[in-house]
């Protein structure tokens, strides 16, 4: 075996590797002899097949297998011999594989950088904390009361905002009735915007028993494409009108929601309000930590990881370019600079966190993955069960969450055990303003 190192600098190791023809021939001959003992060929007993016939039938495939195994073994030997901390698969180039010549090839290996973990205890950050007050809690109770109103009192007066109206309706487009426009005994709360924009408002002022002509235009983004953007006329029959009975927020009200007392329900809502802010706070905290880390890191990163991250960024941008992307209106040069800067930041921080997790022996538990799946589900309101089923039935998709899950766990460990955190309390309005300001400042950096 011969090894000539062509390049060993930075994160690149290139070498020319060779092995004598005699060793290749020996391995091939040994494999052929072993095969003669068990191969079945018509006209010969097992174990009595001439090696020439076995070679003619299986020689090429055996040689290919031997060459592949030999290359893998030689590359692994080089990695071990030079103590290389590799990333990705080594590239095999300039392969010389003629039957009458020595095996030679060039291997190109990309290396992981040597990472020195900075002193994280020197980092200090403010940690926003929502100070929930009674006003916030009472507002949530009022919302709950509004959602659980009882419409038992029939009204003979004119329809007003907030009334529950029972209707029959037939819809027409260009004087032709369409199936999707037919409603029977349909109940709608006026002002809830359940129906097409403008529909409910045109019922205000009518009474039970009256017929109302309603003219609307289906939104351009309406889910039924055959109706989107079209003008429609509805003939609506008002069958009943009910007003809401006042909801009293008392001990009995609390018991309807599995609370032993009104005070317990208030405590539940206070905790819920606090939890709702945690995800946004954690996201900002994570970005602020990454801002600090970015200034401390200056090691080179593997080119393959950098290109991979740039491609991910480009894919994300292309996917969102019609949704008011932050890069809309930017020149090609500005976009490339943005990709380069953000990709370098992501890769450096990702490698640091991976090294830190390894150093601290941080391991993923089932609950860590469940937490990330819950976060994914919250991004799709109303479709949570579909998201849960997707990950339940797709183990490979769960594997794709292991990286983000370990990153989140590592960041939380750093928050809890390393950096200096100073809690800063905000009211609900102050916190919303703070989070909005932080987001705008981050956008302005692009």
From Swiss-Prot:
| UniProt-listed Pfam families | FKBP_C (PF00254), Trigger_C (PF05698), Trigger_N (PF05697)
**UniProt-listed InterPro entries:** PPIase_dom_sf, PPIase_FKBP_dom, Trig_fac, Trigger_fac_C, Trigger_fac_C_sf, Trigger_fac_ribosome-bd_bac, Trigger_fac_ribosome-bd_sf, Trigger_fact/SurA_dom_sf
Decide whether keyword Isomerase is in the record: yes
User: Where does it live in the cell?
Assistant: Cytoplasm
Q: Which UniProt keywords apply?
A: Cell cycle, Cell division, Chaperone, Cytoplasm, Isomerase, Rotamase
The cellular component terms of Gene Ontology attached to this UniProt record, alphabetical and capped at eight, are: cytoplasm
Q: Name the GO terms of the biological process aspect.
A: 'de novo' cotranslational protein folding; cell division; chaperone-mediated protein folding; protein transport; protein unfolding
Q: PROSITE patterns, from UniProt?
A: FKBP_PPIASE
Catalytic activity, as annotated: [protein]-peptidylproline (omega=180) = [protein]-peptidylproline (omega=0)
- What's the Enzyme Commission number for this chain? 5.2.1.8
Q: Boundaries of each PPIase FKBP-type domain copy?
A: 162-247
| Superkingdom per UniProt | Bacteria
Q: Which GO terms describe its molecular function?
A: peptidyl-prolyl cis-trans isomerase activity; protein folding chaperone; ribosome binding
Q: Which family does it belong to?
A: Belongs to the FKBP-type PPIase family. Tig subfamily.
The record's PANTHER family line, in alphabetical order, gives: TRIGGER FACTOR CHAPERONE AND PEPTIDYL-PROLYL CIS/TRANS ISOMERASE, TRIGGER FACTOR-LIKE PROTEIN TIG, CHLOROPLASTIC
Q: What's the entry's take on its domains?
A: Consists of 3 domains; the N-terminus binds the ribosome, the middle domain has PPIase activity, while the C-terminus has intrinsic chaperone activity on its own.
As for what it does, the entry says: Involved in protein export. Acts as a chaperone by maintaining the newly synthesized protein in an open conformation. Functions as a peptidyl-prolyl cis-trans isomerase.
Q: What is this protein called?
A: Trigger factor
Source species: Rickettsia typhi (strain ATCC VR-144 / Wilmington)
Lineage summary: Bacteria, Pseudomonadati, Pseudomonadota, Alphaproteobacteria, Rickettsiales
The primary gene name is tig
